[in-house]
Every structure is written in C-alpha cells, then in structure tokens.
Amino acid sequence: MKSVLYSYILFLSCIIINGRDIAPHAPSDGKCKDNEYKRHNLCPGTYASRLCDSKTNTQCTPCGSGTFTSRNNHLPACLSCNGRRDRVTRLTIESVNALPDIIVFSKDHPDARHVFPKQNVE
C-alpha cells in the first residue's frame, strides 16, 4: 500500500513541477550557445539554473550527483533519484483518491507497460 501511495506522490510531484509554463525568449542571433536551450526551448538532461531576461538566454546546468532529469524540461532543479518523501505531508487522502491510474512504460521495452490501478486510500 505504501509503494502505491509513493508512486502516486511521485507522479503528482512530476505533474506539478512539469506543469509550469516558463518559456524563455528566443536567442537574438537565432543560435543557442552550449549552455543554453538547444531544442524546443527546453533543457534536456539539465535544469534551468538561470531563467532568461530581456538581455540573456536561460542557462542550463547539468544535474548533480544523486539527481536527474530524463526528459526535456523547464525545471528549476533536478529531481532526486530517491524521490521526494517530504511531499507526503502535503497531500490529503482526497487528493490521492482523485488521481487516475498510473501507467509506466519502459524506455528499453516500449511495448511493455505496468499499470498501477487507482486504489482508494482510507
């Protein structure tokens, strides 16, 4: 039961973090430098350590030890490899029960999937 709850919490925290709408401005010369957004105005494998302003582009920094980002993102920090357990205290039973089923796909085996069915928490 705890593992399902932690899965829901991790899923919800990813939605909250990735749901931000932080779009950088386009580089003035039409080209990005090595430490700036390279693809679709996002930071793949890194995090947005400094957001753009009217004079400079967003700066992306590689994730440190014990953290990661596996997809393009606008995150202000990398995600912990161990998850964010402190989010448990911020959720109510009602918010966990409102979540849909979680379907996890394997990067190495795209046809394989695992479904974590919605279970009401009491």
Swiss-Prot record:
Keywords: Receptor. It comes from the Viruses. Induction: Expressed in the early phase of the viral replicative cycle. The protein is truncated in this strain and presumably inactive. It has similarities with variola virus CrmB, but the product is inactivated due to several premature stop codons. This is Truncated CrmB protein. It comes from Vaccinia virus (strain Western Reserve).
